[in-house]
């Protein structure tokens, strides 16, 4: 069985990704901040590591436990991410909020990818591939939102992480891609549901509905399944057509 690591696995997009891989007969090691295992009924094929992505020790422990539990790592899905605790105008954004968001979303993603990549490079090559890495970015990587500037900057950083590792790891047969979710029904967007309901009703999206975590999980699995071995450094917009920027 193939083995995938998924950060931010306890809810929303991360939990949907866990389910998608389990249904396709992968074993999964997941990390999240919750003390409670989100999938206690799947102990033979799911291993949970409680930890904080911004912590160097927790990242290393996550990879170590994954490797000792299920062996070689075939895929990494970087889902873990946070929004600012409070939306503030760009002119009022604090260093504390910036540091918190960047430490998890960007720094954590960068150094977890680095840690896993070193393991993947040692994998035997099969059909030209040693492993797959998929980052979860956001439409905020290229869309200005001045009430949560730290989040936009962090996700733009994730997009560059994708490009950098795609370039660096191509010689080893490790494609690195990202999925850019649009307006997805998760805990993160629940606080602004009315705002986005009105925008969608007003024609913001060609596909006029909220996205679901399963929409993202389907795209992630496609990129990690081996079905697209000649694709790397690609950003896949799963956003109902938001990126079309219609007039």
Question: PLM ranges: what are they?
Answer:
Residues 87-90, 94-99, 201:
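Substrate-binding pocket helix/loop in short-chain dehydrogenase/reductase
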Residues 203, 221, 232-247:
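Short C-terminal tail/terminal secondary-structure segment
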Residues 113, 154-157, 162:
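Active-site helix of classical SDR
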Residues 138:
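Residue(s) in the substrate-gating loop at a strand-loop-helix junction
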Residues 205-216:
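A conserved structural motif in NAD(P)-dependent oxidoreductases
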Residues 118, 167-171, 229:
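Alpha-helical segment proximal to the catalytic Tyr-Lys
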Residues 10-11:
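Conserved glycine-rich cofactor-binding loop
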């Amino acid at each position: 069985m193939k083995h995938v690591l998924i950060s931010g696995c306890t809810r929303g997009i991360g939990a949907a990704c866990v389910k998608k891989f389990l249904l396709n007969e992968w074993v999964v090691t997941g990390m999240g901040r919750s003390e409670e295992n989100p999938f206690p009924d799947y102990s033979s094929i799911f291993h949970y590591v409680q930890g904080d992505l911004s912590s160097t020790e927790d990242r290393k422990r996550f990879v170590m436990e994954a490797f000792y539990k299920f062996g070689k790592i075939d895929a990494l899905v970087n889902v873990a991410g946070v929004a600012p605790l409070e939306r503030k105008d760009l002119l009022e954004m604090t260093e504390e909020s910036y540091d918190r968001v960047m430490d998890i979303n960007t720094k954590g993603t960068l150094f977890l990818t680095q840690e896993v990549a070193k393991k993947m490079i040692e994998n035997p090559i099969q059909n030209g591939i040693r492993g797959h890495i998929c980052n979860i970015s956001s439409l905020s990587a290229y869309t200005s939102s001045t009430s949560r500037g730290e989040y936009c900057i962090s996700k733009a950083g994730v997009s560059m992480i994708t490009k950098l590792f795609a370039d660096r790891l191509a010689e080893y047969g490790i494609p690195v891609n990202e999925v850019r979710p649009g307006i997805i029904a998760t805990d993160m967007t629940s606080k602004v549901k009315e705002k986005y309901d009105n925008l969608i009703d007003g024609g913001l999206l060609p596909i006029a509905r909220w996205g679901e975590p399963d929409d993202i999980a389907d795209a992630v699995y496609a990129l990690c399944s081996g079905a697209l071995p000649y694709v790397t450094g690609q950003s896949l917009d799963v956003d109902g057509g938001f990126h079309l920027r219609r007039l």
